[in-house]
Curated annotation (Swiss-Prot):
Family under the similarity heading: Belongs to the DXR family.
Pathway(s): Isoprenoid biosynthesis; isopentenyl diphosphate biosynthesis via DXP pathway; isopentenyl diphosphate from 1-deoxy-D-xylulose 5-phosphate: step 1/6
Organism: Thermosynechococcus vestitus (strain NIES-2133 / IAM M-273 / BP-1)
Name of this chain's protein: 1-deoxy-D-xylulose 5-phosphate reductoisomerase
Record bears the keyword NADP: yes
Amino acid sequence: MSPPAVDIKVSTDAPPKIVKALNLLGSTGSIGTQTLDIVAQYPDRFRVVGLAAGRNLERLIPQIRQFQPEIVSIADPEQLPELEAALADLPQKPQLVAGEAGIAAVAAYGDAEVVVTGIVGCAGLVPTIAAIKAGKDIALANKETLIAGGPVVLPLLQEYGVKLLPADSEHSAIFQCLQGVPEGGLRKIILTASGGAFRDWPVEKLAQVTVADALKHPNWSMGPKITVDSATLMNKGLEVIEAHYLFGMDYDNIEIVIHPQSIIHSLIELQDTSVLAQLGWPDMRLPLLYALSWPERIPTNWSPLDLVKAGDLTFRSPDHQKYPCMGLAYAAGRAGGAMPAVLNAANEQAVALFIAEAIAFLEIPRLIEMVCDRYSAQNIPNPTLEDILAADRWARATVQELAQRGVSPMVAL
């Protein structure tokens, strides 16, 4: 048989099975457990060197027994005796560390080639920097690292010659679509959003939202913080800032569209108006696996996308009145400097207060707007890491102060 007219260099041979060593930050969370599912399914491709977790020992201890890491970190040093006792029968015991220094130690530890950052929030920034300085590639599932720390992280990637690969669905989709696109060929990034728990609610009903309502995501299984962010569409606003840093795209050329089915994970428009998209069932393991295996494609036995079963794919413009957080994120991104760090910290704190039932749902964007307005006059254009961490602390304290005084819910910008 003659060779094909178009040589796309498809190999029917399985890729060489090189075991890749991983350090996993946030092992007991949603990203962490799904990453370990991948490791368990492909033990001939991946091995765990280090685990960093929070306070969930009930979930962490079985992970240690199954994956046998060399080092383990937990958030609370007071839990170390309990963890040591639970592992007393292990013939090979991991090194146990704790606190913020412990997370950074795991991030930089040993012969791990890749660090998966699954820690929620700005807490992932310092350990990610530690991993970069140790020369380890980053599978980024913690968007706040770039949102808050972009001005610091990007130069460090260049300085230490490490790769940062997106491990969340939207930015992985963009990254996959960009494979083979020549420099200068990208015109626009289109981020798709499910619309969250309240996509079909009228604006007037949002004043009645409960925490339980906000945590009912229609498509994805995620942690509570990111599920609330999806309900406010702040998640997508933060992803706009992340896309700006990841792909160097101007904010005017990053668009958000509501796509309720969550089958198209994002799209790119090229200079000739061609549009490329990445499709798949809503499954976080897919972008995680690609970030871990890139540039390879590892065969899986997961359910492939069936377009007939998927049915109609629909799109609509987001409602700026319903989703004011989206506009706040664009404004913070355009302001640059430390302002995205302030936006992110204010959002984290406001969402935590909402989940604790200390504020109403509509107070989340109002608090964020007030904090960003206060900070605008003191924004630092080229912040250091210390500047970013100081801005983060200031924003959290200011949210607490404003919440204690009481705020009026904002419906529209």
